[in-house]
Amino acid sequence: MLTTKQKELLLFINDRIKDTGVSPSFDEMKEALDLASKSGIHRLITALEERGFIRRLANRARALEVLKLPDSAIPPPNARQRRDFRPALVTNQGAEAPRIAGMIPLVGRIAAGSPISAIQQENGQVASPGGLPEGDDYFALEVQGDSMIQAGILNGDTVILKRTNTAQTGDIVVALIDGEEATLKRLRRKGASVALEAANPAFETRIFGPDRVEVQGRLVALIRRYE
């Protein structure tokens, strides 16, 4: 299953090859996805290659071949002209399922450990735990990892988050790092820097410049199932 970034890049490459017969340059791909550096494109291409969606052709410049597209792939309108794209951890790129009152969309998995590429596909809905203010926009993610165990968040839990791009120091948030990797951590502001702090001494606090971290949601509730 592809992340939104991977799918966006795959469709961009596929469209460009169809139009021109040549795959786009790394600079063109970086611009199309609005990434800060080409290293992010390298990682996305490697991930697509490992998953069997593309391959690199030897001894040819700008040589990428699209081997397949996801079954659900529907190229977004004006994909080649999009310059306002911003990473969105929880934006569903396909048709949305009908919303049911009292239900919250489950949009994928989130790392409570080392950052991982978040899955950008709606996986159903979960019942609202109740007590949440009406009128706010919520989403749910399944937790992978144990970096937040001392905050009471365990591997396999489902976290409910309020969709927001702002947070106070000390809030537990979904953070997007460099527009690619997502993690669930406690946010601390240290001067001009942003620290993503685990609640497990086995994990180090990671510190970034403010332009490298984008808050996607703030933790408001947790659901745990006992088998």
Curated annotation (Swiss-Prot):
Catalysed reactions listed for this entry: Hydrolysis of Ala-|-Gly bond in repressor LexA
Record InterPro entries: LexA, LexA-like, LexA/Signal_pep-like_sf, LexA_DNA-bd_dom, LexA_repressor, Peptidase_S24_LexA, Peptidase_S24_S26A/B/C, WH-like_DNA-bd_sf
Site feature location: Cleavage: 112-113
Protein name according to UniProt: LexA repressor
Top-level EC class as recorded in UniProt: hydrolase
Pfam families: LexA_DNA_bind (PF01726), Peptidase_S24 (PF00717)
Record keywords: Autocatalytic cleavage, DNA damage, DNA repair, DNA replication, DNA-binding, Hydrolase, Repressor, SOS response, Transcription, Transcription regulation
Gene3D superfamilies: Umud Fragment, subunit A (2.10.109.10), Winged helix-like DNA-binding domain superfamily/Winged helix DNA-binding domain (1.10.10.10)
SUPFAM superfamilies, sorted: LexA/Signal peptidase, Winged helix' DNA-binding domain
GO BP terms: DNA repair; DNA replication; negative regulation of DNA-templated transcription; proteolysis; SOS response
MF annotations from Gene Ontology: DNA binding; serine-type endopeptidase activity
Record function comment: Represses a number of genes involved in the response to DNA damage (SOS response), including recA and lexA. In the presence of single-stranded DNA, RecA interacts with LexA causing an autocatalytic cleavage which disrupts the DNA-binding part of LexA, leading to derepression of the SOS regulon and eventually DNA repair.
Quaternary structure (record): Homodimer.
Organism: Hyphomonas neptunium (strain ATCC 15444)
Active site: 147 (for autocatalytic cleavage activity), 185 (for autocatalytic cleavage activity)
DNA-binding segment(s): 26-46
EC number(s) given by UniProt: 3.4.21.88
Family indicated by similarity: Belongs to the peptidase S24 family.
